[in-house]
Amino acid sequence: MQISTRHLILLVSSLLWALSTNGQFYQGSYQEFGKNRVQYKDFLWQQFRFQEFDTYFYEGGQELAEFTSRVASKNIHSLEEVFDYPVRDKIQFIVYNSHSDFKMSNVGINGDDEGNIGGTTQIVGSKVFIYFEGDYIKFEQNLRKGIARVLINKRLYGGNWRDVIKSSTLLNLPDWYIEGLILYASQAVDDDAQNIIRNDVMTGAYEKLNRLEGRNAAFAGYALWSYIARTYGENIIPNILYMSGVSRNVESGFLFVLGKSLDTITKEFIAYYRGEYGSMSMDKTAISLDKLDIKTKGDRVLTTFKISPDGRHAIYVDNILGQYRLYLYDVLSGKRKKILKAEHKLLRIPDFSFPVIAWHPSSGAFTYAKEWRGKLMLCTYNLDDGKTTEREVFTLDEILSMKYSPSGQQLVLSAVDNGQTDIYLYYNIGNRQERLTDDVFGDFDPSFSKDGNRIVFTSNRPDDTLRTKPEPIVLGQNRDVFAYDLKSRSPYLERITDTPDLIEKDPYQYEGRQYTFLADYKGTTNRYVAVYDSAISRIDTTIHYRFFTVAEPLTNYNSDLLDYTVHPNTGEFSLLTYADNDYQFYHGNTSNDGAATRVATEEGEGGLSEEPITNRPIRRESLEEAELTFLPDKEEEHSDQEININNYKFEGEPDYTYERETITLMEVPSDNEEYRPSEQGYTVLDTLPLPGARNYNVNFTTDKILAQLDNTFMGEFYQPLSGPDGLNPGLGGLVKLGVSDLFEDYKIVGGFGLAGSFDNNTFMVMAEDLTRRTDRRIQLFRQQSRFSPNGFNLAENVTYQAAYRLSYPLNEVFSIRGSGMYRFDELILLATDQFNAPTPNEISNYAGVKGELVFDNTLPMGLNLRRGMRWKVWGEYYMDPTN
C-alpha cells in the first residue's frame, strides 16, 4: 500500500496538533533540509589516462569510454579555436552509461547555502559529466557542451581559486549568455529545438532576454550568438567574452567590441531571423488534418502523441522539470484520464526518453516502458478494466522506442546495452528478447511491416551489411532508412534511403514497397513517402539489376513534426507539432496520401529533385548537397534464362508509374571491397592506442568557499539556557571551506565563526560518505560563548559535540534520518573578583538519539525565495550517561 505525500502531511499535522509538548530553547533559525540522490547500485570506477585528459567509466561503459577517448582530443582543439583560449588543465571526462545512472550520482548536491547573504563561491573545475542516451551523435554533442562549459568558465572566471573568488563576486551572467554560448559552440541543437526557436522569434518571445528561463533562455542565446557569428564573424565571439570578463559587465562586452548596445543587437537579430523565417514560410501550407482539442499548459514539454489503431483513443505525455504525466484521451468525447505520474519536479537535466509507448493492434491496450527504482519495467494498461500489469525487462539498460507486431505477440525494440543501440525482438510469452543487430552503429525507430515479416528502422551505418561488432572506422552523423527481413534473417539489409547529411526518423512500411518517414529536407521536418523499385543495370551472361528509391513529400508544413505514428494495418496516423506557442495534435488516415502525392507532383511543391535547403538560418554548418531520392546501386544476379529486355515485368511487382528521373548517387563496391565512405557526414574515430584501464583512487579538490557576515549558529544545536544574551551569537564572520572527490561522493567541510567582540566563536568539521544509498555523516563541533548570568558576573560556556548521522532516501525529496550524538558542556565562572574565583566549573555530559522525517521539493526562485514545500518532523531523546 502506497501513502501519498498529501495523506502523509495530513497525518503528521494531526499528530502535531494532538501532542502537548513543552518548548525548549532551540536554535531554530537554521534547519537542514535538502534533496536526495538515490543509488540503486554501486559504481566501481576505472580510468584511461592521457596527456590532455582522463576518462572515467564503470562496469558496462568501457565502449563509451573508448569512444570518448577517441573523439575528445579533436573536440578540445576545435573548441579552443572557437574561444581562442587553450585548455591549460587536464580535463576529467566522467562517463555514465545512461541518464538514469547519472541521476543516481551526487553531482550538484549542495546544502542550503543559497540562503546566506554572503553566498557561496563554487570553484571552477575541469570536470565534464556526460551520459549516454542511445545515440552517439547526442553523446558527442554532450561532450562538446561539457568542454565548452569548462572553457567558458575558465575564460570568464580564471584558472585559479583567487581569480574565481574575485570574478564570481563581481560577475553575474544571465542564462541566455552562458547556456546559449555553450549551445552555439557545441552545435547541440536538433530540429525540434530549431522549431521552437522559429516559433519564439515569430511570436516576440525573445524581446526581453533577461526574463527568459531554462531552455527558452538557452535557445534565445543560441540564436543571438549564431547571428553575431554570421554577421560579424565567428572570431569576434572570443573578444566579446574577454571584454565581458574584464569589465565584469555583459553590456560592456557587446558595446566595446561591436559598438552597439545589447538592446540594439537584440532588435537586430530578431529582425534578421524574422526575415529569414518569413521567406522560408512563403511556400508552406497549413495542416488540413483533423485537430484534437487537447489543452496543454505553457510550461510543459510534450514528448509523445500516439493515436490508437482504430483512431478512437490517443496517448500523450507531458513533462515539466523532469516530472512526466501520461494521459489517455478519448477522441470522441474529448475527455482525458491520467494513467501515470512519475518523478519529481527538480532543477536538473530532464529525461525526455521515458515513458516509451506502443499501442496494441487490438486498440484495447497499450504498453509503456518506464524506469522504477533502478529497474527497467514494461507496463501494459488495459482500457477495458483500467488495470496495469508490470514486468521487469532484464539485460537491457534502456528502451528508446518500440512497436507491436500485427499479431500482438511480439514487440520490436530499439534498446541500449553496454553502449550499443540495437534492434531486439521481444516475446510477450516468456518475457525474453532476441537480438537482431549487434554492432556499434545506432539503430532507431523500428516498426513492423503490414504483414509482420519485415522490420523497418533508421540507422547511421555506412552500408547495408550486418556485422558482429565491426571495427568502428566511421560513425555516420545521419540516419538512413533500412529494412530487415525477419523470415530469411539475411545479414544484408535493404537500404531505402542514402542521405549523408539528413536524418530520417519514424519510418513505416505501407503496402508493398512503399515507405513513409519524417525528414528535414526543406528547412522543416515533414512527412515523405518513398517507393523502392528496381531496373536493369546491365546484361552480360546474367542480368544485373539496380535498386533505387523514388521519394515524394506528403506534406510541406511550416512547423516541424515532433512525433509521428502510423498503423499500417488500419491506416490511422497521428502528428504532433509546435506552433503559435502551443502544441497541436492532429490525426488522419493514409488513404489520403495518394492524393497528397499527386498534388505535390503536379504543383511541383517540395519535390526532392529540387535543390535542397542549404542555408537554414541558424545552423553553424550548412547542409551539403544531399538527395533523399537517391540510393547507391546494388547489383543482384539472376539465372541465365532468356528474357525479352524490351518487354519484361517483375513477378509480384505493383504497377507503379514514376514521373521523376532517378539518378544514381554512388556505386556500392563489390562484396570483396571494403566500404570506406568519405569523412563528410561521418565521425571518423581517432586511432590512438588506448592505455590499460586503472582503478580510481580517491583524491580531493576544493569545490566551494563560503565567506559572509552572519548572526546565527552554525548548525542545529541546543543552546545552554543563559538568559537573553544567548539568543544569538551576535554579528560576526563565518568562513567555510569544502572539498570533495572527483565524483562528489566524499565531502569534507570545515569552518569557523567569530563574533565581532570575539566573545563567541564556533569551530566545526564534517565528513560525508554518499557512495551508497544510505548516506553517512560524522560531525565534530565546538562552541564557546560568554554571557552574564546575573548582570554582574561573567561566565563562559564551552561545548563539544560529536554526532554521527545516517540518512536513507525513500526518493529524491523524502528521506528518513537517524542520528546519535555525545555532548560535553563546561560552564566556567570567570574570576572577576576574589569571591567567584574559587567557584568550581560545572560539567555536564549528554548522550542522545534523534529521528527525522524530512520532505523538501522546493525550487529556488532567487535569493531566499523558494517555491514548493518543505517540512520536517523529528523526535529526540537525551540522557546523562554519568548518572
Question: Which ranges hold each PLM region?
Answer:
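Beta/coil-rich, acidic/histidine-enriched accessory regions frequently appended to metallopeptidases
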Residues: 26-32, 36, 45-47, 246-348, ...
